[in-house]
Amino acid sequence: RQAARVCSTRFQPENWNIDPIQRRNNCYNYATNIQTNTFAQPGRASGRRYRENVGGEVYSACLRDGLTGLRAPDAGTECLIALVVWPGEDYHFYRLDNNGYWSHKSGRTEARNTDDSGDPIIDPRTADRGPYSDFVGWLGVGPRARVN
């Protein structure tokens, strides 16, 4: 498990797994812990979404939304999230919770703290992510982050 630092979200699926919140918020909302009920898309808050569903495009769109780019899984005082992509198809985010494990919410499904094999997520780089084969990188979520 990774040590969660100053900003750590608690895994509280009851805040996300109720309608209409569950069906109107996706993995980007969940990872950033910002409920918009708009099914947020990277770059939409900044007015410039990603053009293609490839790692660099989605990552850059997140930076435009005010997230912090990180080279290592250490967000300091910000909340730590991870971006993965299913090349050409979809993106997905995971977030580090205050218990040192990771959790996520796929699209309109329930928030959960297990991977596609049903195992606790210790590290999103090595978890069973299904078709999301490309680990793109780490991002920090701080007060500048805006999603929509």
Curated annotation (Swiss-Prot):
Q: Which parts of the sequence are annotated with region: Disordered?
A: 105-128
> Source organism's superkingdom?
Eukaryota
Q: What UniProt keywords are attached to this protein's entry? A: Secreted
What tissues express this gene product? Component of the acid-insoluble organic matrix of the calcified shell.
Q: What is its main location?
A: secreted
Reply yes or no: does the keyword Secreted apply: yes
Q: Does the keyword Secreted apply?
A: yes
Intracellular or extracellular location(s): Secreted
Identify the GO cellular component terms for this protein: extracellular region
Instruction: Write the protein's name.
Output: Insoluble matrix shell protein 1
Q: Which organism is it from?
A: Ruditapes philippinarum (Japanese carpet shell)
